[in-house]
Amino acid sequence: MVALRRDEPILVVGGGPVGYRKTCSLLDGGASVTLVSFSFCPELRELIAKGIVTAEERGVQRGDFERFRFAVLALPPEETRAALELREGTQCLVCCCSLPELGDFALAAQWNHGNFRVGISSGGTDPAGAAKLKGLIRAFLEGKRLRR
Protein backbone atom coordinates (compact mmCIF):
# COMPACT_ATOMS: atom_id res chain seq x y z
CA MET A 1 0.00 0.00 0.00
CA VAL A 2 1.31 3.42 -0.91
CA ALA A 3 -0.45 6.12 1.09
CA LEU A 4 -1.23 9.26 -0.86
CA ARG A 5 -2.79 10.94 2.18
CA ARG A 6 -1.07 11.13 5.55
CA ASP A 7 -4.00 12.91 7.20
CA GLU A 8 -6.00 9.69 7.53
CA PRO A 9 -4.17 7.14 9.70
CA ILE A 10 -4.38 3.40 9.24
CA LEU A 11 -5.24 1.27 12.27
CA VAL A 12 -2.94 -1.62 13.18
CA VAL A 13 -4.40 -3.99 15.77
CA GLY A 14 -1.76 -6.13 17.48
CA GLY A 15 1.48 -5.16 19.16
CA GLY A 16 3.69 -8.17 18.46
CA PRO A 17 6.30 -8.92 15.77
CA VAL A 18 3.70 -9.19 12.98
CA GLY A 19 2.20 -5.85 14.01
CA TYR A 20 5.70 -4.36 13.96
CA ARG A 21 6.46 -5.68 10.46
CA LYS A 22 3.12 -4.46 9.10
CA THR A 23 3.58 -1.07 10.78
CA CYS A 24 7.02 -0.72 9.18
CA SER A 25 5.58 -1.64 5.79
CA LEU A 26 2.86 1.00 6.16
CA LEU A 27 5.34 3.64 7.35
CA ASP A 28 7.62 2.81 4.41
CA GLY A 29 4.63 3.41 2.13
CA GLY A 30 4.08 6.86 3.62
CA ALA A 31 1.12 6.01 5.84
CA SER A 32 0.33 7.42 9.25
CA VAL A 33 -0.27 4.60 11.76
CA THR A 34 -2.31 4.26 14.93
CA LEU A 35 -1.72 1.11 17.00
CA VAL A 36 -4.15 -0.59 19.35
CA SER A 37 -3.03 -3.50 21.54
CA PHE A 38 -2.97 -4.69 25.12
CA SER A 39 0.84 -4.75 24.88
CA PHE A 40 3.60 -3.73 22.46
CA CYS A 41 6.88 -5.40 21.53
CA PRO A 42 10.09 -3.40 22.21
CA GLU A 43 10.42 -2.33 18.56
CA LEU A 44 6.92 -0.84 18.54
CA ARG A 45 7.53 0.81 21.92
CA GLU A 46 10.53 2.53 20.34
CA LEU A 47 8.41 3.86 17.46
CA ILE A 48 5.81 5.04 19.98
CA ALA A 49 8.45 6.75 22.17
CA LYS A 50 9.88 8.56 19.14
CA GLY A 51 6.40 9.80 18.15
CA ILE A 52 6.54 7.98 14.81
CA VAL A 53 3.22 6.24 15.51
CA THR A 54 0.39 6.83 17.95
CA ALA A 55 -0.80 4.03 20.20
CA GLU A 56 -3.51 3.09 22.65
CA GLU A 57 -2.81 0.29 25.12
CA ARG A 58 -6.16 -1.52 25.12
CA GLY A 59 -8.22 -3.99 23.13
CA VAL A 60 -9.79 -3.13 19.80
CA GLN A 61 -13.35 -1.76 19.93
CA ARG A 62 -16.12 -1.38 17.40
CA GLY A 63 -15.59 2.38 17.47
CA ASP A 64 -12.10 1.84 16.05
CA PHE A 65 -13.58 0.31 12.91
CA GLU A 66 -16.09 3.15 12.69
CA ARG A 67 -13.28 5.72 13.00
CA PHE A 68 -10.76 4.22 10.53
CA ARG A 69 -11.26 3.36 6.86
CA PHE A 70 -8.40 0.83 6.78
CA ALA A 71 -7.19 -1.59 9.44
CA VAL A 72 -4.52 -4.28 9.63
CA LEU A 73 -5.34 -7.13 12.02
CA ALA A 74 -1.98 -8.51 13.16
CA LEU A 75 -3.60 -11.02 15.49
CA PRO A 76 -3.88 -14.79 15.96
CA PRO A 77 -6.82 -16.42 14.10
CA GLU A 78 -9.30 -16.48 17.01
CA GLU A 79 -8.63 -12.84 17.90
CA THR A 80 -8.92 -11.94 14.22
CA ARG A 81 -12.37 -13.56 14.05
CA ALA A 82 -13.48 -11.64 17.16
CA ALA A 83 -12.21 -8.36 15.68
CA LEU A 84 -14.03 -9.08 12.41
CA GLU A 85 -17.28 -9.43 14.37
CA LEU A 86 -16.71 -5.97 15.86
CA ARG A 87 -16.01 -4.59 12.37
CA GLU A 88 -19.18 -6.01 10.84
CA GLY A 89 -21.48 -3.32 9.45
CA THR A 90 -18.78 -0.64 9.35
CA GLN A 91 -17.10 0.69 6.21
CA CYS A 92 -13.60 -0.23 7.42
CA LEU A 93 -11.58 -2.42 5.04
CA VAL A 94 -9.27 -4.92 6.75
CA CYS A 95 -6.11 -6.87 6.07
CA CYS A 96 -6.19 -10.10 8.10
CA CYS A 97 -2.61 -11.28 8.58
CA SER A 98 -3.44 -14.68 10.08
CA LEU A 99 -6.53 -15.32 7.93
CA PRO A 100 -5.85 -13.54 4.62
CA GLU A 101 -8.88 -15.11 2.93
CA LEU A 102 -11.16 -13.15 5.30
CA GLY A 103 -9.58 -9.78 4.53
CA ASP A 104 -10.35 -7.06 2.00
CA PHE A 105 -6.74 -6.30 1.02
CA ALA A 106 -3.16 -7.47 1.54
CA LEU A 107 0.00 -5.45 2.01
CA ALA A 108 2.87 -5.77 -0.45
CA ALA A 109 6.50 -6.40 0.45
CA GLN A 110 7.80 -3.02 -0.74
CA TRP A 111 10.84 -0.79 -1.03
CA ASN A 112 12.00 2.45 -2.64
CA HIS A 113 14.08 2.33 -5.81
CA GLY A 114 14.99 5.82 -6.98
CA ASN A 115 11.73 7.72 -7.51
CA PHE A 116 9.71 4.51 -7.51
CA ARG A 117 7.91 2.49 -4.86
CA VAL A 118 8.21 -1.19 -5.81
CA GLY A 119 6.03 -3.89 -4.28
CA ILE A 120 5.55 -7.64 -4.48
CA SER A 121 2.41 -9.34 -3.21
CA SER A 122 0.99 -12.85 -3.11
CA GLY A 123 -2.40 -11.45 -2.15
CA GLY A 124 -1.74 -12.56 1.41
CA THR A 125 -1.32 -16.26 0.58
CA ASP A 126 2.49 -16.45 0.84
CA PRO A 127 4.03 -13.45 2.65
CA ALA A 128 7.36 -15.26 3.16
CA GLY A 129 7.54 -16.00 -0.57
CA ALA A 130 6.76 -12.36 -1.39
CA ALA A 131 9.53 -11.23 0.98
CA LYS A 132 12.00 -13.62 -0.64
CA LEU A 133 11.05 -12.47 -4.15
CA LYS A 134 11.36 -8.86 -2.96
CA GLY A 135 14.93 -9.58 -1.85
CA LEU A 136 15.84 -11.16 -5.19
CA ILE A 137 14.35 -8.36 -7.31
CA ARG A 138 15.78 -5.66 -5.06
CA ALA A 139 19.26 -7.21 -5.27
CA PHE A 140 18.93 -7.41 -9.06
CA LEU A 141 17.81 -3.77 -9.37
CA GLU A 142 20.62 -2.64 -7.10
CA GLY A 143 23.16 -4.62 -9.13
CA LYS A 144 24.16 -6.97 -6.33
CA ARG A 145 25.47 -10.46 -6.98
CA LEU A 146 22.87 -13.08 -6.22
CA ARG A 147 23.76 -16.25 -4.34
CA ARG A 148 22.62 -19.47 -5.90
Regions found by a protein language model. Give the residues of each.
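Glycine-rich adenosine-cofactor-binding loop
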Residues: 1-24, 37, 129, 148
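Alpha-helix C-terminal capping/helix-to-coil transition sites in glycosyltransferase folds
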Residues: 6, 66-68
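Residue-level detector of alpha-helix initiation sites
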Residues: 16-18, 78, 124
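NAD(P)-binding Rossmann-fold cofactor-contacting core
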Residues: 21, 29-47
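Short loop/edge segments at beta-strand edges and connector loops
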Residues: 37, 55-59, 98
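Glycine-rich, highly charged phosphate/nucleotide-binding loops
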Residues: 46-66, 74
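ADP-ribose/adenylate-binding Rossmann-like module
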Residues: 70-75, 81-106
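Adenosine-phosphate binding glycine-rich loop
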Residues: 109-148
